Amino acid sequence: MAAAALMTMSALTGCSGKQAVQAVDLTAVSFDEIQKKAKEEGQIASVGMPDDWANWKGSWEAITEKYGLKHEDTDMSSAEELSAFDSEKDAPTKDMGDVGQAFGPQAVDMDVVQPYKATVWDSIPDWAKDPDGKWVISYLGTMSSMANTANVSEPLDSWEALKNSGCKVTLGDVVRGASAQMAVLSCAYAFGGGTDNLEPAFQFFTELAKEGRLDAGTYSLERMTRGEIDVYLTWDYLTLQYRDLAVEAAPDINIACHVMSDGALQSGYALVINKYAPHPYSAALAVEYLLSDEGQIDRARGYARPIRSDVELPSDLAEKMIPDEEYADAIPLTDNEAVSAACAEIASRWEEEIIPLMN
């Protein structure tokens, strides 16, 4: 399949010494030509794709080995990535990034990304990609629990089960932590609320706090292996990774990970190519690899759920993942503004209403 339309801007130095940009139309360029041009470029600079997140390290090592591209990454938040694309447009240094799901449409609105449709485009759900190819989700994270079964006898696979378990709950820093805030928001959905109604979650956690069942501490491997944590709530790609680390550190420990069936927010991360990418062919080639079977399996090795359901995971890896059926009722995050407003409310109300009950 030929590469889909790809418009990029490459920096050229003019006679005045200032940087100018010139459009390079890759509409008619085949995938073979992209590979050839990428080899000539020989390098790629990404943002927001650090080695220790979702096994990006494995993918970049594979891309370097397979295509000979020298890679470097600068870790940034999603907002910082798009800001960098825009601010550097006259002298670009970044080629591509990985942004939170809600930032894909925002990137299009800012006009800082360009289209590319990988050869596996048709196997990606419509909701997970821009129709013009300007962003595409490559993996998902879903709110989940990890429980020390020595402390918790019943599976904690729902907020209702958690409510009735009697165990102490670890969320981390709800005032400042995004994942902890997402856990509270997931709880709101479980009991009939949502971004515009957080009351069910605050009723739930108020009761837990009064019962002494809210852990004031944060998660750490040491606390988990010492048996100080009953259950911790965060994204599945973290709970599964933390499970492995706990078992490695304390072979006798048994950790059970589940998606919260009655309220589990799900958020994806989208690949974007800088409109002004200095190495556009390398960026397109990287997107191609990251959406390939190999690239999707790389994400799964980092315990992120691949966006492509047609990729068959190796049996040894599939056995380590949370079963597919637990994701049936996951709630996708689509409205960034509503989520941001809800998180701000969660942070302020938690500080005012919950923390005093924990002291």
Where would I find each of the regions flagged by the language model?
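Extracytoplasmic "Venus flytrap"
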Residues: 23-32, 39-58, 269
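Extracytoplasmic/periplasmic substrate-binding proteins
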Residues: 214-276, 311, 315-320
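Mature extracytoplasmic/periplasmic domains
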Residues: 264, 269-334
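Short, solvent-exposed beta-strand edge segments and adjacent coil->beta transition regions
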Residues: 41, 140-142, 266-270
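Short, low-complexity disordered leader/linker segments with a strong preference
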Residues: 1-41, 359
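Conserved C-terminal helix/tail region of periplasmic/extracytoplasmic solute-binding proteins
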Residues: 27, 328-359
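A short alpha-helix/helix-coil micro-patch that ends at or immediately precedes a cysteine
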Residues: 59-67
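Extracytoplasmic ligand-binding site segments that recognize negatively charged/polar headgroups
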Residues: 45-60, 72-86, 90-229, 242
